[in-house]
């Protein structure tokens, strides 16, 4: 049995078992079971109010589950690891100072948090494909470009 568990988590990035999340008496998630494999792409779809955002917040550790367990790479959320401290999350519409360039937005953040050098910021922007646009104001970025800037921010904070 132990051998099976080890091999299961080698190929599993997220394992959700019997997860229920209640707000008061109302269950938003009820007995959710889900296994997400490494190297696969998944989407969460459903009607408004069906619990998609709540599920994502539980996986990230931003909301505790009422019952059940969520493991990310074998580590249980809320017990084995403090994921909000160690996880980079990119929201659907990242908020940046639109009058400044992508470089300037990341430099401001780096200065506030005493993080990385300006040269490293430029390397990260190149890695996410924003080097040709690094001097363009973020207000002129497409949504996809803003999301890539959000990815650059998450990389920078890692």
Feature-to-residue mapping (PLM):
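The feature captures the beta-strand-to-loop junction immediately N-terminal to the Walker
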Residues: 45-47
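Helix-to-loop junction immediately C-terminal to a conserved catalytic motif
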Residues: 60
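Conserved ABC transporter NBD signature motif
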Residues: 68-83
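Q-loop/switch helix immediately C-terminal to the Walker
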Residues: 93, 99-112
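Conserved ABC ATPase "signature" region
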Residues: 107, 118-133
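Hydrophobic anchor residue at the start of the ABC signature
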Residues: 151
